[in-house]
UniProtKB/Swiss-Prot annotation:
Name this protein carries in UniProt: Phosphoenolpyruvate carboxylase
Domain of life (superkingdom): Bacteria
A GO biological-process term: oxaloacetate metabolic process
Enzyme Commission number(s) from the entry: 4.1.1.31
Cofactor(s) named in the record: Mg(2+)
Length: 876
């Protein structure tokens, strides 16, 4: 590995050595030697040594069944530790400038000055800053909570080892602690034995807040504040909350029968309990710190005659928070809740603490006010008494089913059979009516009752507890109006954002016309109070049409939605449903935001953070601070220095690229009879269904083909055999087509001058770097029928041609030339991923040969799937 990454290499080597010792202690020298042999042969095979490749295959095919699991676990754990070392390196003091780019906020102000952006405009943009990160389960997040805790502890040890003043014995103790943690991880289950429930997923999300975001948010705001003061001479307002967090865990019922109205209620109680518990810890600490006596009149009035007025106020809050926790615990456990004074409104926390803050400043103790107390005030504004807000998500047909069943009961006909015009007229009439629509005597079916119960659960909450109601597979104006009507009938006393999610190619293309129709309805315009949220789906559109066509459809949809809402003088918030992988919209945050259409971030940024990406971007406080800074700087830059509108000839060529790439993608995925059998044989798609990943079934329709697969297992399966097909298919072919038609210079101009296009190519480069045609070919040879080999060869040949086409447009000799750190990081992990790939192919072969399932083989297979996902760093 390059010399400039020596600190990282040293940590990887140390952690690997410690894991080796653990394996020796647990399984003896012979197994450790076997693991080392496989690792060395794999490294040599990757360098092109065909003789060692043959030896490696022979070694794996002759492994006895009882060695498969420990060998798979060894490489999986090596990858976990490599990831930790890499993640830590980005925040360590040894981080090279190629990795740790200059501070994103400082860099931004440099750009603003260079472009003569006025101080006034900058200050206004900061005040308007509104970033909402939506934590979603889709847990491709394979790591269990227990493992994540150990990984955080390992990170702390690496940090301690950087301290130059450590004595020899102190260093030994830290190294011993590292060895203990690695041994603990080795002797624990790597993967879950049962699927997580929606409650488990929600608790995982709360753990991320508790372990990382609770600490990261005040630190991010403290740093942001200092930079604003330095560059603009202005501080953040005390009540500013430029960042907020929402969750789908326990609220996303799209295709997940396990997320019921009862589950949603319980998750919201748990969320409040965790918030009360965390604030109680903060208040306890403040009781210790704020022993001061001098105060202003307001605090004196709140504290009465107490000698230590701040402590008196804090102790009262402590009692109420303790009561709140006890009452919520009773409700969670379905017990009678005691009648106690509790915190039920965020102002009950904010008002007394804000009074303490003001008093300390007025009494010459500003330095004390700006310590922990300021952090707690910042947390109150960010997390509130609910910790995270909850989104509700449901599929559009579930709402129309409710109204169809109701209209049939009322003798009005079948709503489902009406045309769109009649549906809208009926819904608007009922929305404007003051009388209730649901008859008391009506006894709906269980599925319909569940939708109604969910709307009731929403109506019971306070507005602050909720984010938005997202309608997946939204296609029409009536889809949006139907939800508004159901919420009205449930007695919802507040306006909740009802957010259509446009996710297929056709729906993205029609999205703006749906919003335009809604804006023409007087009732709707009056009700939404000049604010509209729309979600752009990345994963299903890419599965439907391929990444190039999907990316362009998303861009055009955003452009058109911005225009429609500007014409109607309505503020638009675009909600981005990105995934961790490229095939689901994943891209480095900064590049992705700056490649969006001009003015598309004026209404703020709302974006999903999914599964494993939550851990990589937000799982450690220091890493989370960096991620929040990147989001803030990119959003500010996009609003203050928007990218130029694309030239007409660029858009015309993108239309061609989109059409050609979509046709090419669909010709393979839909047009080839061999494709589905090949997909099922060459990837672990069928076996993935057995992995206890998330609480959702892997298919919307258990009997369907590829089209019924959720986007996550579709991408996940292809990332396992290293072909990563959905993340590139069609794109390179379209680029080569345009080169052949004489558009090479235009493509180069687009790459150089248009952030949207250059970001697309950069994403493709990263995908290409992660592919491995040799590994994909081995899966074919070991697992597929010979009749399917030509299809596999055709796809691999296409991949090689596509890489050349993209490098040609970029004028680069090698992939990821502009991102050497990213390329090094992928190479570093490949040392351990490739043996796991070869082992997985062997495990799949043996599993499929057996009539009866073998628990040993199945567990080893699950470990290999988890390990490759860890190594690829974006599972789905």
């Amino acid at each position: 590995m390059n010399e400039k990454y020596s600190a990282l290499r040293s940590n990887v080597s140390m952690l690997g050595h410690m894991l080796g010792n653990t394996i020796k202690d647990a399984h003896g020298e012979p197994l450790f030697d076997k693991v080392e042999t496989i690792r060395k042969l794999s490294k040599s095979a990757r360098a092109g040594n065909d003789s060692d490749r043959a030896k490696l295959i022979d070694e794996l095919q002759n492994l006895p069944d009882d060695q498969l699991l420990p060998v798979a676990r060894a490489f999986s754990q090596f990858l976990n530790l490599t990831n930790i070392a890499e993640q830590y390196h980005t925040i360590s003091r040894h981080c090279e400038e190629q990795i740790c780019s200059p501070d994103s906020i400082d860099s931004l102000f440099g750009k603003l000055n260079a472009n003569s952006i006025s101080q006034l405009d900058s200050i206004q943009a900061v005040r308007d800053l509104n970033i909402e990160l939506v934590l979603t389960a889709h847990p491709t997040e394979i790591a269990r909570r227990t493992m994540i805790h150990k990984l955080v502890q390992i990170n702390k040890c690496l940090s301690n080892l950087e301290l130059s003043e450590l004595s020899h014995s102190e260093r030994q103790r830290v190294e011993q602690r590292l060895e203990q943690l690695i041994a603990q991880a080795w002797h624990s289950d790597v993967i879950r034995k049962q699927r997580p429930t929606p409650l488990d997923e929600a608790k995982w999300g709360f753990a991320v807040v508790e372990n990382s975001l609770w600490h990261a948010v005040p630190e991010f705001l403290r740093q942001f504040d200092e930079k604003l003061m330095r560059h603009l001479g202005e501080k953040l307002p005390l009540d500013a909350s430029p960042v907020k967090f929402t969750s789908w865990m326990g609220g996303d019922r799209d295709g997940n029968p396990f997320v019921t109205s009862e589950v949603t209620r319980e998750v919201m109680l748990l969320s409040r309990w965790k918030a009360a518990d965390l604030f109680l810890g903060d208040i306890q600490e403040l009781v210790s710190e704020l022993s001061m006596v001098k105060c202003n009149d307001q605090v004196r009035e709140l504290a009465g005659e107490e000698h230590e007025p701040y402590r008196a106020i804090l102790k009262d809050l402590r009692t109420k928070l303790t009561n709140t926790r006890d009452v919520l615990a009773a409700k969670i456990n379905k017990q009678d809740a005691p009648n106690l004074a509790t915190i039920d409104d965020v102002d009950q926390l904010w008002t007394p603490l804000h009074a303490c803050y003001q008093s300390l400043r007025e009494c010459g103790m500003g330095i004390i006010a700006d310590g922990l107390l300021l952090d707690v005030l910042r947390r109150i504004k960010c997390f509130g008494i609910h910790l995270v807000r909850l989104d509700i998500r449901q599929e559009s047909t579930r709402h129309s089913d409710v109204i169809s069943e109701l209209t049939r009961y009322l003798g009005l006909g079948d709503y489902e059979q009406w045309n769109e015009q009649d549906k809208v007229a009926f819904l608007v009439r009922e929305l404007a009516s003051k009388r209730p629509l649901l008859p008391l005597a009506w006894q709906p079916s269980a599925e319909v009752q569940e939708v109604l119960d969910t709307c009731k659960a929403v109506a019971e909450q306070s507005r602050e507890a909720l984010g938005a109601y997202v309608i997946s597979m939204a296609r029409t104006a009536s889809d949006v109006l139907a939800v508004h009507l159901l919420l009205k009938e449930a007695g919802c006393p507040f306006r909740l954002d009802v957010c259509p999610l446009f996710e297929t190619l056709d729906d993205l293309n029609n999205g703006a016309s749906v919003i335009k129709e809604l804006m023409s309805i007087d009732w709707y315009r009056g009700f939404i109070q000049n604010h509209q949220m729309v979600m752009i789906g990345y994963s299903d559109s890419a599965k439907d049409a391929g990444v190039m066509a999907a990316g362009w459809a998303q861009y055009r949809a955003m452009e058109e939605l911005v225009e429609v809402c500007e014409d109607a003088s309505v503020e638009l918030t675009l909600f981005h449903g990105r995934g961790g992988s490229i095939g689901r919209g994943g891209a480095p945050a900064h590049a992705a935001l700056l490649s969006q259409p001009p003015r598309s971030l004026k209404g703020g940024l709302r974006v999903t953070e999914q599964g494993e990406m939550i851990r990589f971007k937000l799982g450690l406080p220091d890493v989370a601070v960096n991620s929040l800074s990147l989001y803030a700087s990119a959003t500010l830059e996009a609003n203050l220095l928007p990218p130029p509108a694309p030239k007409k000839e660029w858009c015309d060529l993108m239309d061609v690229l989109s059409e050609v790439s979509c046709e090419s993608y669909r010709n393979v995925v839909r047009g080839s009879e061999e494709f589905v059998p090949y997909f099922r044989a060459a990837t672990p798609e069928l076996e993935l269904g057995k992995l206890p990943l998330g609480s959702r079934p892997a298919k919307r329709n258990p009997n369907g083909g590829v089209e019924s697969l959720r986007a996550i297992p579709w991408i996940f399966a292809w990332s396992q055999n290293r072909l990563l097909l959905p993340a590139w298919l069609g794109a390179g072919e379209a680029i080569q087509y345009s080169i052949d038609k004489g558009h090479a210079q235009l493509l180069e101009d687009m790459c150089r001058e248009w952030p949207f296009f250059s970001t697309r190519l950069g994403m493709l480069e990263m995908v290409y770097t992660k592919t491995n045609v040799g590994i994909a070919e081995y899966y074919d040879q070991r697992l597929t029928d010979k009749s399917l080999w030509p299809l596999g060869q055709k796809l691999r040949d296409q991949l090689q041609q596509d890489i050349k086409a993209v490098l040609n447009v970029e004028n680069n000799a090698h992939l990821m030339e502009q991102n050497p750190w990213g390329a090094e990081a992928i190479r570093l992990r490949n040392i351990y991923v490739e043996p796991l790939n070869m082992l997985q192919a062997e495990l799949l072969y043996r599993t499929r040969q057996q009539d009866e399932p073998s628990p040993i083989l199945e567990e080893a297979l699950m470990v290999s799937i988890a390990g490759i996902a860890t190594g690829m760093r974006n599972t789905g």
